[in-house]
Amino acid sequence: MKDRARLGQLLLTGVPGKELDPETAKRFRKLQPGGYILFGRNIESPEQLRKLIDDLRDLSEIEPFITIDQEGGRVSRLRLIGSEPPNAQQLREKADLKLIDEHGRLTGQVLRMFGFNLDLCPVLDLSFDDEADNSLKGRCWGTNPDEVIRNAATFNKAMRREGVLSSGKHFPGYAAAEVDPHHELPVIDKTLEEMEELELRPFRALLPDLDSIMTCHSHYPCWDADRPRWPASLSKNIIGQFLRNQLAYEGLVMTDDLDMGAVLNEVTFEETIEACIEAGNDLAMICHRVELVEKADEVIATLPDPILYDALVRIEKTKKKMASPYPWSIDRFREIDAKIWDLRVKTLGEEQAKILSVEDGKRSPVELY
């Protein structure tokens, strides 16, 4: 059980640059992480990105998750080398499920071309305020549960048909957050009944069709009143008792980025790693402080065997569903990218489509990660 290649499977790590330097390659070869998450800092050109992903796969003894946030709009890492897809709000306001289906299909196709096998979406949070300063602006599929369920399910089904796995986020829902978890810990002071009426409905509806769930960094007194300022991503009550037991979810569960301020400012690194796995997460996500993945691995090695075994089984089961990358073709990439631009024009109109998403300086710069 304490086999190095297996314990590393519980880690989803970022990558420092646009290519694997010798030190990073040595670290990953030794650690054997379960997966890698890429950001704008890793993307320079189509050919470079495919080579980076091929290199990550080549040094892995067990096929890794290769993941990214490719939602649409400002949270579209691939817009650095291609077209920016419309975001969830723009598509929902168009009110055409055929366009959402097309968005899902094209997202799956372009990701598979590069070798990504898991996309960290759909967002299942509701939008209570489209202008809220909580990182969700433009990213939500609806303002009520039924709208989110209808639209997110359409996107999710279409993307998965193309062979790319999905992750519903941000469980159990942080639409009511008044601050951005990238910077500080939101407190969602709602009753469980209120959560069930709104935030939890999309998760309940889509659970059977999601390949994984991402837990969020918000505090919920209705579950953890005895642990003030304890994030949901580390909560046994929310993940172990509610998600695993009450909702009977047996699939893969991962944390959101443990480098966010909502966790960094509240809990030590060692306690964070220990708590997130003991709570019921299978993957601990470390996006930016890549130099700490060895320390995380050491902490994981101290955890009880039954906890590690259950996580490894869920990881292995999910990985069996991963599809292989398409053979690389720059011409095929350009063909898919042209269709993404056409979708943007159909959604926004030709003139509006030319205006790409920008940050207003008040929101979290999630697309720059």
Question: Residue ranges of each PLM-predicted region?
Answer:
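Short, conserved phosphate-binding/catalytic loop or strand-edge motifs used
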Residues: 124-135
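Second-shell residues forming the walls of enzyme active-site clefts
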Residues: 14, 20, 41-59, 64, ...
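Catalytic domains of carbohydrate-active enzymes, especially glycoside hydrolases
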Residues: 25-39, 106-118
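Preference for extracellular/luminal or secreted protein segments
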Residues: 1-34, 236, 246, 264-369
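A generic, well-ordered mixed alpha/beta core segment in the N-terminal half of proteins
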Residues: 83-115
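Short, flexible, mixed-charge acidic loops at enzyme active sites
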Residues: 76-85, 132, 173
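Second-shell loop/turn segments in exported
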Residues: 40-42, 89-98, 137-144, 299
